[in-house]
Design a protein with these regions (language model features):
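Repetitive helical segments and hydrophobic/amphipathic motifs
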Residues: 11-12
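Low-complexity intrinsically disordered segments
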Residues: 110-170
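C-terminal motif of bacterial Sec signal peptides marking the signal peptidase cleavage site
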Residues: 15-18
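Bacterial N-terminal signal peptides that target proteins for export
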Residues: 1-8
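N-terminal interaction modules that seed assembly of large macromolecular complexes
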Residues: 63-87
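Phosphate-interacting basic helix/loop segments used at nucleotide- and nucleic-acid interfaces
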Residues: 46-61
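Bacterial Sec signal peptide processing site at the extreme N-terminus
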Residues: 20-31
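Mature extracytoplasmic domains of secretory-pathway proteins
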Residues: 82-122
Length: 170
């Protein structure tokens, strides 16, 4: 992935949403959440582990987020962009809203990354397939990357445990 990202010339966007939930951070402020995401010692959180692995692999990284809402993270040649998708009540509405937003705000996107937890798990959607459908509806020529880590320390897209997360950046 690292070589592919470098070839595309875009940053890796590390997800900060839900950061540190294992330490009961539902009441934390956005600043506290971001502090946890960027603190090398806060490895109890999924995004801190991803962030540390990316840094170790010398991958250019932008940390975005800190909300507790469905959010799509977009990597462009100029850096990372966060699109907040709170509101839609259905997968179809969410997909349409995301596609329209991407067409309007990030037409030059080179990669998309999707948050792990709050993206409508209750609907049972396969998130890897969903983000590709969104990119397709947005007429994006982008290569789609998905990094999704669950609180049970495995990905719903591709079974990767946290201790093996460095392999994502090789």
């Amino acid at each position: 992935m690292k070589k592919m990202m470098m070839a595309l010339g875009c940053a890796v966007v590390i997800v900060a949403t839900g950061c540190g939930r294992t330490t009961n951070t539902d009441t934390k402020t956005k600043e506290e959440v971001m502090m946890n995401a960027t603190n090398d010692t806060a490895l109890s959180s999924h995004c801190a582990r991803l962030f540390a692995a990316a840094k170790e692999a010398d991958v250019p990284t932008v940390v975005e987020g800190g909300t507790f809402m469905p959010t799509l993270y977009v990597a462009t040649e100029k850096g990372g962009t966060m699109i907040n998708l709170a509101g839609p009540e259905s997968i179809d509405a969410l997909r349409d809203m995301a596609a329209q937003t991407m067409r309007e705000k990030v037409p030059d996107a080179t990669a998309y990354l999707l948050d792990y937890a709050s993206f409508y798990e209750k609907d049972g959607a396969h998130k890897g397939a969903l983000v590709m459908e969104i990119a397709d509806k947005a007429d994006a020529a982008a290569k789609v990357f998905v990094i999704i880590c669950n609180r049970d320390e495995k990905s719903v897209y591709d079974p990767v445990r946290h201790e093996d997360v460095k392999s994502l950046f090789k």
